[in-house]
């Protein structure tokens, strides 16, 4: 591990697959929330509800919330990587639309 972050070295990973699927439609299913923890009320936090994420990205949900005293957690690094992928898709789409718009403007003179 490195200070301030987790280990991300390729040499520590197996079955690496770059995400080529379109992510943006699935990202739209995530529901950001603001909330307070019951045990630490008074401090507003931002994040997601694990049970909501479970519907779209079960692989990002940690723990066993089904057990009597179990709770769910989230792999926020995983959510971040999907968010970056979605942002990349959006940038490429905007660039394509800008190019098409400029081509139409040029045709109209």
Tell me the role of every PLM-derived stretch.
Residues 1-18, 22:
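Small/polar residue-rich beta-strand/coil "junction" motifs that cap repeat-based extracellular fibers
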Residues 8, 15, 59, 63-109:
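C-terminal intramolecular chaperone/auto-processing assembly modules
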Residues 16, 27-30:
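A generic structural signal for nonpolar/aromatic side chains embedded in well-ordered alpha-helices
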Residues 23-26, 83:
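Stable alpha-helical elements in mature extracytoplasmic
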Residues 30-40:
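Functional cleft and adjacent loop/helix regions within the main domain
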Residues 45-47:
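Short, conserved beta-strand/beta-arch hydrophobic-aromatic motifs that form part
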Residues 53:
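Active-site-adjacent helical/loop segments in soluble small-molecule enzymes
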